[in-house]
C-alpha cells in the first residue's frame, strides 16, 4: 500500500508499509541484504567501495536504476567543485538526468549544482524543506519522486578531466501499487546569457497535461547598474495567451522579501541573504573565491541565487503551463528595462507523457561569467 512519508511529524507514528532500499557505490542495485559487501585494507565489509572513481570525460554513468512501483525519498551527493584552477566549474559541467517508467527522454535535466540551488559552479548553504546543501558540498534533495514501472538516474561528465571521486546515495521505498492519479517529478534548467530587452525570460514552457508547479531556482548575473528586482513573475495557465492568470509584484516579492532586501552597513546599502523552509536568497558574490592569480584579481559580475518552493501554494494546471519573469530595474530616473544573464531551474509534477526538453546548451555556454 502506497503511503507517502511527506506528512511531517503529525503522521510519523502511523505504521509505514513500504520496503526501504538504498542505492550507492556500496550497493549499486539496492539489493536486500547486500549492502557494504566490498572489502578494503581493513577487511571484508569495511568501506570497500564508498564512491565512484575516475569518471572519464564524456562518460555517462547510471547512478541508480530500480524497478517499481516505488518512490525516491531522498538523494544525497557530494563531489569536488574543481579539478584544476583552470577547470573549476565541475558543478556546471556535470549533468544529472532522471527517467521515469519507459520514457526515452528525461523528465529531469540540469547541471548538477543548479539542480540543488547552487548555480555559477559554486556551492552555498541552502536550508529549505525539499533542498538542503550543507558543509562541505553535501547536496540533498527531498522531493518525492514516484515511479510505476522503473526509475533511472544518470550522470554525464562533460568536464574536461576525470572526476576522481563521486559520492552518492539514493533512498527509496518499494510498494505493491501506486495511486492511479500519481504525477511525476520534473525539473528543467535554462539560461539566457543576455536577455532580450522588453521580452520576459522564459523559465518554463511547452508543458502539456495535468499537474502542479512546485518551485523555481534562479541564478542571476546582473550586467547593469542599480536595482535589478522589479520584474514580475507570471504564470500562464490552461490557455492563457497575452496575459497570465497569476502575476506578481516584483522579483524580491516572489522570493518573499521586500524593499530590495536592504540594510545599512558602514554607510553602504547591502543586500541580506537568507534561508527559510520555502524561499530564500542563499548566495551573493562579486568575486571568484576559488581562484588566486598573480596577474588579475578575483572580481566578476555580481551573482545572486534564489529559490522559491510552491509546496504550500502549488500552481495547479489542467492542460498547460508557461512561466516567465520580467527583467525590470529601477534607478534614479525610475523604472527601466534591463538586460541581464539569467539561468533557472523549474520544478513541477505532471502526468505523462511530457514534451521533450530543448537541447541543453554546451558546457562552455553554461559556465558563469
Question: In which residue ranges do the predicted regions lie?
Answer:
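Beta-strand-centric surfaces of beta-sandwich/beta-rich domains
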Residues: 1-369
Amino acid at each position: 500500500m502506497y503511503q507517502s512519508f511527506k506528512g511531517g511529524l503529525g503522521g510519523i507514528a502511523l505504521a509505514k508499509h513500504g520496503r526501504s532500499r538504498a542505492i550507492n557505490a556500496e550497493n549499486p542495485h539496492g539489493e536486500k541484504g547486500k549492502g557494504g559487501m566490498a572489502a578494503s585494507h581493513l577487511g571484508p565489509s569495511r568501506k570497500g567501495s564508498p564512491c565512484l572513481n575516475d569518471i572519464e570525460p564524456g562518460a555517462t554513468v547510471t547512478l541508480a536504476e530500480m524497478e517499481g512501483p516505488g518512490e525516491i525519498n531522498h538523494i544525497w551527493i557530494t563531489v569536488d567543485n574543481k579539478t584544476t584552477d583552470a577547470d573549476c566549474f565541475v558543478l556546471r559541467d556535470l549533468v544529472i538526468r532522471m527517467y521515469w517508467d519507459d520514457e526515452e527522454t528525461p523528465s529531469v535535466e540540469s547541471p548538477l549544482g543548479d539542480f540543488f540551488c547552487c548555480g555559477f559552479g559554486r556551492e552555498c548553504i541552502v536550508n529549505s524543506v525539499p533542498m538542503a546543501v550543507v558543509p562541505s558540498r553535501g547536496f540533498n534533495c527531498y522531493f518525492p519522486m514516484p515511479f510505476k514501472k522503473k526509475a533511472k538516474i544518470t550522470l554525464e561528465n562533460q568536464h574536461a578531466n576525470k572526476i576522481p571521486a563521486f559520492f552518492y546515495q539514493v533512498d527509496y521505498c518499494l510498494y505493491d501499487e501506486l495511486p492511479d492519479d500519481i504525477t511525476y517529478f520534473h525539473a528543467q534548467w535554462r539560461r539566457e546569457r543576455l536577455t532580450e530587452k522588453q521580452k520576459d525570460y522564459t523559465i518554463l514552457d511547452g508543458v502539456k497535461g495535468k499537474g502542479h508547479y512546485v518551485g523555481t531556482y534562479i541564478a542571476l548575473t546582473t550586467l547593469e547598474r542599480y536595482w535589478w528586482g522589479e520584474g514580475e513573475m507570471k504564470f500562464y495557465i490552461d490557455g492563457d495567451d497575452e496575459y497570465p492568470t497569476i502575476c506578481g509584484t516584483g522579483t524580491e516579492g516572489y522570493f518573499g522579501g521586500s524593499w530590495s532586501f536592504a540594510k545599512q552597513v558602514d554607510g553602504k546599502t547591502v543586500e541580506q541573504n537568507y534561508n527559510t523552509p520555502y524561499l530564500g536568497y542563499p548566495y551573493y558574490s562579486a568575486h571568484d573565491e576559488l581562484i588566486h592569480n598573480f596577474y588579475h584579481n578575483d572580481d566578476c559580475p555580481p551573482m545572486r541565487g534564489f529559490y522559491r518552493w510552491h509546496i504550500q501554494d502549488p500552481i495547479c494546471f489542467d492542460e498547460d503551463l508557461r512561466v516567465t519573469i520580467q527583467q525590470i530595474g529601477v534607478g534614479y530616473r525610475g523604472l527601466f528595462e534591463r538586460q541581464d544573464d539569467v539561468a533557472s531551474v523549474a520544478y513541477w509534477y505532471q502526468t505523462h507523457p511530457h514534451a521533450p526538453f530543448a537541447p541543453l546548451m554546451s558546457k562552455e555556454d553554461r559556465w558563469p561569467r
